[in-house]
């Protein structure tokens, strides 16, 4: 029922976008100079997802973009600096970088949001220094408080800047079972908290567009197009564990999982800002594709050029639980996998076909395209001994 309601709402929102788009195309307006474009601030813009949002917003040429981040001199900030150099060469003034923005500081955020028409607000329980995470979703070290400090600082900054007319939040897929059915795993605290933040801000008078999206991982590989070179090897940005007879995952082989490419998030953020009359104070669900483990195998074998065979191999849940006692890095995917499964909460889309309405606005990333990108289609079978 929840998935059908999401599908119906998405169709209404997409229909509204296409209607307005047709009306605008029939009555074109003069192009505006860069200085006349609305200014959008993107928090945490060195992160995987928010960097993609910055890049996709600049591609539209409809917005000026202010990329906010904390630490200079990191590999992630270098990626932004390279984007700035490319953008300045073609469209001077379209992108500006603002380092030193502490998400816990209302004063810093107030300065960062000044003169902005919109804000992409990303908050996290992770605490890190130059990308080294020290709290990966473990509440005993104060995760809830860490999130709320950022939310309250952001709220104060938004109220101090009435020019901000729309805020976009990026949240997990919706909760369809809590308080409705019994005998389900307890929802992880950071998912439950994030799902409530948009309504918290709305109750304070902030116009929030909430984009529900799944994780940007595919077959235990982080879907990241932001590396300037892409190859199969030892790079943490480009390595995939898919090989002959092995497609890894963290869910059962027959469980349907929604996946996301961060590029698709960036495209839809731009659309939400472009059509505020459609998306103001709306919840909106997106995904790039939806497949089971068995379907991943079928796709990989169909696209491989050498007849190589693959097999879906779930990463043992017992091993993840054991590792979680020693390293915080597996806590997040462990809890995520325990919640979004057959005994817990379902994803927002029941099958790949349910994403067709999204395709009417933006072409979606697909597993087929990524297999080609990773070089999986060129994996040849190993020669058998003898």
Regions found by a protein language model. Name each.
Residues 162-172:
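N-terminal Rossmann-like NAD(P)+-binding domain of SDR-like oxidoreductases, especially those catalyzing
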Residues 66, 96-99, 209, 309-315:
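General small-molecule cofactor/ligand-binding pocket signal
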Residues 83, 284, 297-348, 386:
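Terminal hydrophobic/aromatic helix or amphipathic segment near a protein terminus
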Residues 3-25, 351-386:
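Amphipathic terminal alpha-helices
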